[in-house]
Amino acid sequence: MSTHTARLVWNRTTETMDPKTYARDHQWRFDSGVTVAASAAAGPAIPPGTVGADTVDPEEAVVAALAGCHMLFFLALAAKKGLTIDRYEDAPHGVLENK
Protein backbone atom coordinates (compact mmCIF):
# COMPACT_ATOMS: atom_id res chain seq x y z
CA MET A 1 0.00 0.00 0.00
CA SER A 2 1.20 3.51 -0.71
CA THR A 3 0.06 6.88 0.55
CA HIS A 4 -0.25 9.92 -1.67
CA THR A 5 -0.87 13.45 -0.46
CA ALA A 6 -1.41 16.86 -1.96
CA ARG A 7 -2.14 20.27 -0.56
CA LEU A 8 -4.92 22.45 -1.92
CA VAL A 9 -4.66 26.22 -1.38
CA TRP A 10 -7.33 28.84 -2.14
CA ASN A 11 -7.41 32.49 -1.08
CA ARG A 12 -10.34 34.85 -1.32
CA THR A 13 -9.54 37.71 -3.70
CA THR A 14 -12.90 39.45 -3.64
CA GLU A 15 -14.42 41.53 -0.88
CA THR A 16 -17.38 39.19 -0.40
CA MET A 17 -18.23 35.57 -1.12
CA ASP A 18 -20.78 36.50 -3.77
CA PRO A 19 -21.44 33.34 -5.84
CA LYS A 20 -21.28 35.46 -9.00
CA THR A 21 -17.86 36.96 -8.38
CA TYR A 22 -15.63 34.94 -6.05
CA ALA A 23 -12.57 33.48 -7.79
CA ARG A 24 -12.46 29.75 -8.33
CA ASP A 25 -8.67 29.71 -8.89
CA HIS A 26 -6.62 27.65 -6.46
CA GLN A 27 -3.39 25.65 -6.35
CA TRP A 28 -2.57 21.98 -6.03
CA ARG A 29 0.77 21.51 -4.30
CA PHE A 30 2.47 18.13 -4.41
CA ASP A 31 5.22 16.55 -2.31
CA SER A 32 7.55 16.66 -5.33
CA GLY A 33 7.46 20.46 -5.19
CA VAL A 34 5.25 20.79 -8.26
CA THR A 35 2.45 23.34 -8.04
CA VAL A 36 -0.46 23.21 -10.48
CA ALA A 37 -2.73 26.19 -11.11
CA ALA A 38 -6.30 24.91 -10.90
CA SER A 39 -9.79 26.34 -11.16
CA ALA A 40 -13.37 25.30 -11.79
CA ALA A 41 -14.45 23.97 -15.16
CA ALA A 42 -15.89 26.82 -17.20
CA GLY A 43 -19.54 26.23 -17.93
CA PRO A 44 -23.07 27.52 -17.52
CA ALA A 45 -22.99 27.15 -13.72
CA ILE A 46 -19.75 29.13 -13.38
CA PRO A 47 -19.96 32.91 -13.93
CA PRO A 48 -17.62 34.40 -16.57
CA GLY A 49 -14.48 35.99 -15.16
CA THR A 50 -14.23 33.69 -12.14
CA VAL A 51 -12.08 31.00 -13.78
CA GLY A 52 -8.39 31.45 -14.59
CA ALA A 53 -7.27 31.09 -18.21
CA ASP A 54 -4.17 28.94 -17.64
CA THR A 55 -5.60 26.47 -15.14
CA VAL A 56 -6.57 22.81 -14.95
CA ASP A 57 -10.00 21.92 -13.65
CA PRO A 58 -10.51 18.93 -11.31
CA GLU A 59 -12.59 17.03 -13.86
CA GLU A 60 -9.84 17.27 -16.50
CA ALA A 61 -7.28 16.24 -13.89
CA VAL A 62 -9.22 13.06 -13.07
CA VAL A 63 -9.35 12.11 -16.76
CA ALA A 64 -5.63 12.83 -17.21
CA ALA A 65 -4.68 10.94 -14.03
CA LEU A 66 -6.62 7.84 -15.11
CA ALA A 67 -5.06 7.98 -18.58
CA GLY A 68 -1.62 8.41 -17.02
CA CYS A 69 -2.15 5.32 -14.85
CA HIS A 70 -3.28 3.36 -17.90
CA MET A 71 -0.17 4.44 -19.84
CA LEU A 72 2.21 3.58 -16.99
CA PHE A 73 0.61 0.14 -16.63
CA PHE A 74 0.94 -0.48 -20.38
CA LEU A 75 4.59 0.65 -20.43
CA ALA A 76 5.42 -1.56 -17.44
CA LEU A 77 3.88 -4.59 -19.14
CA ALA A 78 5.70 -3.82 -22.40
CA ALA A 79 9.05 -3.44 -20.61
CA LYS A 80 8.58 -6.73 -18.74
CA LYS A 81 7.87 -8.47 -22.05
CA GLY A 82 11.01 -6.96 -23.59
CA LEU A 83 9.06 -4.75 -25.99
CA THR A 84 10.41 -1.34 -26.99
CA ILE A 85 7.92 1.52 -27.06
CA ASP A 86 9.11 4.74 -28.71
CA ARG A 87 6.02 6.88 -28.25
CA TYR A 88 2.67 6.75 -26.52
CA GLU A 89 -0.17 9.19 -27.02
CA ASP A 90 -3.72 9.10 -25.76
CA ALA A 91 -6.72 11.39 -26.01
CA PRO A 92 -8.89 10.40 -23.04
CA HIS A 93 -12.46 11.61 -22.84
CA GLY A 94 -14.52 11.72 -19.66
CA VAL A 95 -18.22 12.42 -19.25
CA LEU A 96 -19.82 13.59 -16.01
CA GLU A 97 -23.57 13.33 -15.86
CA ASN A 98 -26.03 14.95 -13.50
CA LYS A 99 -28.78 12.45 -12.77
Language model: regions and residue ranges:
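Extended beta-strand/beta-hairpin segments
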Residues: 1-64, 72-99
